[in-house]
Amino acid sequence: MSDSRASSLRALLFASSAAGMLVAAPAFAADVTADDGVIATADQQQPANLGTIDVNGQVRKPAPHSPEYVAPLVDTPRSVTVIPQAIIEQTGADSLQDILRNSPGITFGAGEGGQPLADRPFIRGQSSGNNIFVDGIRDTGGQQREVFNLEQVEVIKGADSVYSGRGSGGGSINLASKSPKLTPFTSVSAGIGTDDYLRGTIDANMPLGETAALRINLMGASGDVAGRNAVDYDKWGVAASFAVGLGTDSTIVASYYHLDSNQMPDYGIPLYTKLGGATAPRPDASGVLNVSRDAFYGLKARDYLNNTVDSFTFDWTHRFSEALTVRNVSRFSTTLNDYIVTNPGDGGSAQQIGGVWWMKRGTKTRWNPAQTLANVTDVFGKISTGGIKHSYDLGLELTREVNRNASYSTFSTSGSACPAPLTGFDCTPVFDPNPADPWTGVINRSAPSRSITETVGLYAFDSISLTDRFLLNLGVRWDSYQTQGVSINSTQTNGVWTINPLIPATPTGTPGVVALPKREWDFVNYQAGLVFKPTDYSSLYVSYATASTPPLIAGGDQNTAGTGQGSGNLANDILEPEDTETYEVGAKANLFNERLSVGLSAYRLTRKNAQLLVDAGPPATYAQVGEVEVKGVELSVSGNITPAWQVFGGYTHMDSELVRGASNSVNVGESLANTPKNSASLFTTYRVLPRLTLGGGVYYVSRSNGGNQGGAGGGTNRIYAPEYTRVDAYAAYDLTDTASLRLNVKNAGDERYIMRTNGVHHADPAPGRAATLTLNLRF
């Protein structure tokens, strides 16, 4: 990290601490004492329990924020995990991937497909990058998300189009933002650590009268990635929300969020295929090339990644009575995912010259701004009809998304010269890459393609109390999903892009600009669940749910400027959405005076209707008959076993299979990519002394196949990430009732493991051991 950047972050940390104390000075909150004896500041998450302490010192169990959840979690016949702010803070998380490590069964895909160099979670083996929401509204565009403004993260698993509309079928993730409260408080954190780690945050909540409040969150951070040469980051963010009518029947919340993140992008290390293709010697069974963990193939003089986000939200809620509440949320957001990154798997096969393996650096590039305008209306409440109780929600969702995509040319004019017979520049030894190699050249951006997507969704939910012990949970949703794209036919020579004038002008009237036809899909999805309650705090359930994935997002990532048409004999046909269904049975219980929540479920997920080559011909014949299946068991635990002992985690077993693949596919019968058979996590803390808490996390993931089917990554040549076990350590010491120190040691054993691989180009090594020390002040 540069000295100037380190100096600026140190100044930010000092300013954060000073500003936080100044903001807090006139508005100290009275301390309240929770039932477990832990000193707590009103409305703040506490290290010793996973609920929220209200102004009366009572623990409120974490629950999803959306009115679509018409029943408490214990009575919801679905696998739903709520990761509260306490876990986010205690684990030292600063990314969505850090948070979701605590929810087994979720993996992250490598940088390929529709969301390269962006969050690409896989839930129950299904790519779910398009199924990330913020406060119930889909968060579009490629991003690597921050956590400083999060109150909790909510994960629903299984086919969930009833909740989310179009989706991948594996589940969805909702990020719940911090919101204004009527209790004054300020939280300030300042952290330092190994690998030039610096991070500072301020969370200030200021009541403005009896029913209004302003909440401001600030974040600045920088550092290097442990164990990865030259990989660093620098980011800052601000979130501000203003609320009026708090504690009354009518509330308005207006909020703004901004994030600016700059980093050196990392595409990991090559696979064995770099040294001669699929038939090359394979020294390691995984297929990952045995190079140093810190081997970095990018160029500091050329590569970069910038993410920016701006989001404006207006939320109005009015409660007419217990039977009727109306909520309307509008949002306008823009995101930009902009990068040039070296892909060690591109650039052709390496060559052995003079006893040294040499390779050319290939590049991946993207300029991807996205814009979203959304409005969601919910009408919800509780009513009784004929002695039967209903908890219902009716909703309307309207969205318009504009997604543009372009790439960069990176024509090198000088730099690291290639030895003969390789020619040109951008060469490096495979086993000794130097990110400080010089580079100069021409960088130009191509004309962008564009897609405009408009959706309308109508939905209804009802939790029906048939008796004191039996509940029926129903949901239905209709969606209209339509999109139209514009593509640009262009070529680049020596770094200069030229629109191809030979393409006839289309209705756009511009040569080379091709307006693709508007495509529209309508689909209806359902869920139904029956719940039996042996006690007030436990339940047994069985449920069924469906999901639909239009062909333009069949990869589970983002909308594309495509046609939605098939291949070969289906070239003139508009493909139908892929269909997913989930059957699930389970049990839930709140134990120990509702301090601890546990859940156990078993499920079968089936995804059908993917386009496949069924006869190689000639002529080649395609049909929508592809099918995958995932069967699994999940165990979850969250809360306090004793007032001093906190646990959060679970175990997932997934038995996945490609049931039907392409003609003569060698992958049929194999487990799916990014779907490890076993995964488990447990983060636990214990208050060993009145002011000292110790703990840590253990994370296990079994072998996970690479992210692509077929080719070098499929069949007998399957690339995979080997199993690993990672251990984190945690300690916290209360200096005073309002000040504490927190020590996090991530990957304490310095385990060398592969987080993920796309199975064709590269594999991503996990960061090495990293330690951080954070001072937390709460007023």
Give each language-model segment a name.
Residues 17, 43-183, 585:
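Acidic, small-polar-rich N-terminal luminal/periplasmic segments of exported/outer-membrane proteins
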Residues 148-151, 162-240, 246-250, 310, ...:
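Outer-membrane beta-barrel translocator/receptor signature
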Residues 221-226, 233, 238-317, 336-370, ...:
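Acidic/polar loop-and-plug regions of large Gram-negative outer-membrane beta-barrel proteins
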Residues 243-245, 370, 389-393, 397-401, ...:
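Structural signature of Gram-negative outer-membrane beta-barrels, strongest in the C-terminal barrel
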Residues 312-333, 363-490:
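Face-selective signature of the C-terminal outer-membrane beta-barrel domain
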Residues 317-321, 325-331, 335-341, 541, ...:
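Membrane-embedded beta-barrel scaffold of Gram-negative outer-membrane proteins
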Residues 595, 599-606, 623-712, 749, ...:
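Gram-negative outer-membrane beta-barrel transporters
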Residues 642, 700-710, 732-779:
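C-terminal beta-signal and adjacent terminal beta-strands/loops
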